[in-house]
């Protein structure tokens, strides 16, 4: 019964997506179904180019970016100091779109971790200096990243199109099989994700016939390809406008000063074909390790995830994408 209900309501939700990306209804039938399954719904907030969720850490308000590109939950060192949180030397390195956070950085535990109305209980965190993200012109203040460790444990489902986050207690029964069946019946392509050391959640990909992988990064506003990865693909780079350059620098912090753009002819993410389009290219931080021999293509950002109605099941490690011709037409028009 639940399976049939989800198939029906998601098909109805798809019918509503013929509006432009930012004109869609705020509440979807998918949301109603997940609430019935015991999920707590939260609406992400936009500030600058980032998407936040309001939290309380040991009773203190904080704004955290929902970031599937962060393997661990990172909290600003200043906030942790203000909380008086005891920190010890961690055993793992932290690496991601922000670059190396350092070897064996300090870590601690938030005893009362609350995301909106959702009570998560205790959760480990790592300390990192986010002060440069609050520079002039950004229009936002970031207290940290809600990483995949938290999202996986609390069975998170992220609706990238409607900007919703759903959380459920780790001990609650899984809804992933029902969710998968409903989304596939609604026309979505299911793509397996893999957690990779120093990266976050990754998906297999091909660009112009070359195999590699992307990091699925909800913490990045824009999709960026690695200049190092596409060097041998005979793709013509052109200088980006100042608008693209500014957005790219904001996405990756101090690691990029110049961003270019490139037009790909064929790109597959799993079995999902992405229509030809321009994307940003930058000299992204990369490591020789990371648990994979494949080529690191870059980051699938929120722009592409929203455009192709992305749903992320963090518990089952699955990404769902769907092509909508009206939404894609709006994308092409906005890009000129």
Protein language model features and the residues they cover:
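Pepsin/retropepsin-fold aspartyl endopeptidases
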Residues: 21-336
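Bacterial N-terminal signal peptides
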Residues: 7-17
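Positively charged n-region of N-terminal signal peptides that target proteins for export
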Residues: 1-4
């Amino acid at each position: 019964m639940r399976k049939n209900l989800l198939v029906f309501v998601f098909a109805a939700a798809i019918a509503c997506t013929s509006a432009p990306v930012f004109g869609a209804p705020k509440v979807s039938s998918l949301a109603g179904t997940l609430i019935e399954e015991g999920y707590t719904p939260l609406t992400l907030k936009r500030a600058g180019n980032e998407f936040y969720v309001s939290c309380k850490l040991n009773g203190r308000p904080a704004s955290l970016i929902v970031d599937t590109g962060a393997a661990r939950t990172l909290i600003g060192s200043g906030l942790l100091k203000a909380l008086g949180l005891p920190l010890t030397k961690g055993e793992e390195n932290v690496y991601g779109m922000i670059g190396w956070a350092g070897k064996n950085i300090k870590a601690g535990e938030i005893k009362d971790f609350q995301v909106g109305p959702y009570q998560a209980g205790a959760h480990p965190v790592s300390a990192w200096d986010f002060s440069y993200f609050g520079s002039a012109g950004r229009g936002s203040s970031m207290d940290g990243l809600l990483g995949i460790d938290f999202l996986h444990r609390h069975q998170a489902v992220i609706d990238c199109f409607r900007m919703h986050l759903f959380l459920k207690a780790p001990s609650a029964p899984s809804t992933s099989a029902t969710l998968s069946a409903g989304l596939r019946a609604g026309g979505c392509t299911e793509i397996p994700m893999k957690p990779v050391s120093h990266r976050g959640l990754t998906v297999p990909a091909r660009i112009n016939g070359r195999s590699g992988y992307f990091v699925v990064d909800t913490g990045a506003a824009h999709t960026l390809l690695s200049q190092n990865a596409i060097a041998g693909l005979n793709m013509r780079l052109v200088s980006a406008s100042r608008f693209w350059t500014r957005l790219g620098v904001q996405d990756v912090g101090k690691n990029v000063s110049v961003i270019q753009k490139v037009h790909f002819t064929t790109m597959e993410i799993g079995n999902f074909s992405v229509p030809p389009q321009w994307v940003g290219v930058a000299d992204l931080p990369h490591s020789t390790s990371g648990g994979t021999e494949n080529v690191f293509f870059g980051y699938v950002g929120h722009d592409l995830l929203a455009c192709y109605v992305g749903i992320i099941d963090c518990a089952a490690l699955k990404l769902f994408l769907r092509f909508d011709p009206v939404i894609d037409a709006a994308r092409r028009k906005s890009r000129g």
